[in-house]
């Protein structure tokens, strides 16, 4: 199945010169959405993960059904101030400013084997921060999963030493 048929290019969104890759058509089509989750599962099942970690918010769209498909626990990584219990955080730089991500301190433990899911690999900063959170809790990061990878932004360079898997590349 050619997933690119279900990812629309939206020029000049959210600002001039940007081509936004819209995944909503992929999500709206039940067969395509199901196949996307199946493809992600096929890529990591042999790694024998214990948890699926996903990044707010679009990573949740793929991470939760992937965890369900694999029969694993789901761990959300959220933006600052969104988790109700004790958490750890990491801040990272964006092109214009910075962001902070958090994970509950009891979400993972030493010996856990995780795959981390997000919708798009762009610069790699968000994923690198998420890897740091998981490793600080003692988990082993087995793979980093993306539906889309924007090759020109070279996000893989920030993720050296990790298994990076993307379904569609632009």
Curated annotation (Swiss-Prot):
Coiled-coil region: none
Enzyme type, top EC level: transferase
Keywords: Cytoplasm, Glycosyltransferase, Purine salvage, Transferase
The protein's name in its UniProt record: Adenine phosphoribosyltransferase
PANTHER family xref list: ADENINE PHOSPHORIBOSYLTRANSFERASE
Pathway: Purine metabolism; AMP biosynthesis via salvage pathway; AMP from adenine: step 1/1
GO CC entries: cytoplasm
Localization in the cell: Cytoplasm
NCBIfam families named among the record's database cross-references: apt (TIGR01090), PRK02304.1-2 (NF002633), PRK02304.1-3 (NF002634), PRK02304.1-5 (NF002636)
GO molecular-function term, one example from the UniProt record: AMP binding
Presence of keyword Calcium: no
Annotated PROSITE patterns: PUR_PYR_PR_TRANSFER (PS00103)
InterPro entries listed in its UniProt record: Ade_phspho_trans (IPR005764), PRibTrfase_dom (IPR000836), PRTase-like (IPR029057), UPRTase/APRTase (IPR050054)
A single GO BP: purine ribonucleoside salvage
Family: Belongs to the purine/pyrimidine phosphoribosyltransferase family.
EC number: 2.4.2.7
Protein purpose: Catalyzes a salvage reaction resulting in the formation of AMP, that is energically less costly than de novo synthesis.
This protein's record includes keyword Translocase: no
Reaction(s) the record says it catalyses: AMP + diphosphate = 5-phospho-alpha-D-ribose 1-diphosphate + adenine
Main location: cytoplasm
Top-level taxon of the source organism: Bacteria
Quaternary structure, from the entry: Homodimer.
Species per Swiss-Prot/TrEMBL record: Carboxydothermus hydrogenoformans (strain ATCC BAA-161 / DSM 6008 / Z-2901)
């Amino acid at each position: 199945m050619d997933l690119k048929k279900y990812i629309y290019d939206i020029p000049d969104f959210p600002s001039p010169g940007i081509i936004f890759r819209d995944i909503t058509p992929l999500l709206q089509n039940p067969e395509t959405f199901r196949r996307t989750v199946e493809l992600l599962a096929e890529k990591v099942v042999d790694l024998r993960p214990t948890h699926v970690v996903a990044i707010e918010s679009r990573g949740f769209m793929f991470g939760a059904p992937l965890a369900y498909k694999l029969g694993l626990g789901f761990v959300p990584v959220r933006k600052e101030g969104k988790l109700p219990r004790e958490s750890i955080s990491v801040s990272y730089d964006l092109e214009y400013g910075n962001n902070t991500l958090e994970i509950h301190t009891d979400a993972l433990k030493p010996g856990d084997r995780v795959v981390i899911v997000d919708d798009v690999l762009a610069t790699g900063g968000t994923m690198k921060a998420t890897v740091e959170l998981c490793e600080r809790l003692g988990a082993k990061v087995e793979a980093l999963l993306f539906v889309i990878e924007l090759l020109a932004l070279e996000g893989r360079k920030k993720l050296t030493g990790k298994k990076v898997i993307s379904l569609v590349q632009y």
